[in-house]
């Protein structure tokens, strides 16, 4: 295990909703890959405690989804604060990627970054300012090469680690079928 500025940091957050001014982070996970998308390490998968009054105000979709996948119970049982989860995540990332080297990688990462800026600013600052957003390729493929856009199907568990693994596989799919490096 050694730091490499070419390694990529993949992240996913689960939140109580989409508005960082009203909602909070309830789960965070990270994976580090090399530049060729080979998984080097999985970081801690952390449920972040949030009070019941916040969880009770989630949308019907969030309540249904995060209850069905077990996340609500994990959040209620967790003792972790956002700050503790942030520090554990940074400690993991320091083993693999120098600060400021990797773009934030994943699906719709601009949304995750909004929450990181608000609730985990030191982690937000760990990333390069650029984004590697798989959803950009998904949108382009849907418009420019629709015959491949249905070729990758997600399980949609809405658990952070599962979502990251799917994002990495999805980018590999687009690399093979859409970008075609060879």
Swiss-Prot record:
Disulfide bonds: none annotated. Keywords: Cytoplasm, Exonuclease, Hydrolase, Nuclease. The gene is orn. InterPro entries: Exonuclease_RNaseT/DNA_pol3, Oligoribonuclease, RNaseH-like_sf, RNaseH_sf. One of its GO terms (cellular component) is cytoplasm. It holds the Pfam family RNase_T. The active site is at residue 129. SUPFAM superfamilies: Ribonuclease H-like. PANTHER family: OLIGORIBONUCLEASE, MITOCHONDRIAL. Belongs to the oligoribonuclease family. Its EC number is 3.1.15.-. Residues 8-171 form the Exonuclease domain. This is Oligoribonuclease. The keyword Manganese does not apply. It comes from Actinobacillus succinogenes (strain ATCC 55618 / DSM 22257 / CCUG 43843 / 130Z). It is an enzyme of class 3 (hydrolase). NCBIfam families: PRK05359.1. It comes from the Bacteria. 3'-to-5' exoribonuclease specific for small oligoribonucleotides. GO terms for biological process: DNA metabolic process.
């Amino acid at each position: 295990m050694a730091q490499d500025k070419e390694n990529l940091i993949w992240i996913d957050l689960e939140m109580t909703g989409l508005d960082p001014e009203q909602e909070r982070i309830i789960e965070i996970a990270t994976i580090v890959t090399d530049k060729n998308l080979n998984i080097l390490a999985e970081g801690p998968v952390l449920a972040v405690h949030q009070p019941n009054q916040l969880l009770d105000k989630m949308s019907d979709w969030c309540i249904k989804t995060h209850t069905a996948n077990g996340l609500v119970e994990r959040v209620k049982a967790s003792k972790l604060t956002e700050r503790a989860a942030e520090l554990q995540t940074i400690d993991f990332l320091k083993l693999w990627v120098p600060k400021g080297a990797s773009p934030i990688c994943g699906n719709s990462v601009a949304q995750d970054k909004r929450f990181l800026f608000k609730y985990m600013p030191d982690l937000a600052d760990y990333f390069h300012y650029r984004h590697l957003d798989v959803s950009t390729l998904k949108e382009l493929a849907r418009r420019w090469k629709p015959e491949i856009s249905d070729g990758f199907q997600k399980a949609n568990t809405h658990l952070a680690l599962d979502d990251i693994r799917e994002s990495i596989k999805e980018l590999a799919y687009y690399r093979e079928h859409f970008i075609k490096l060879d």
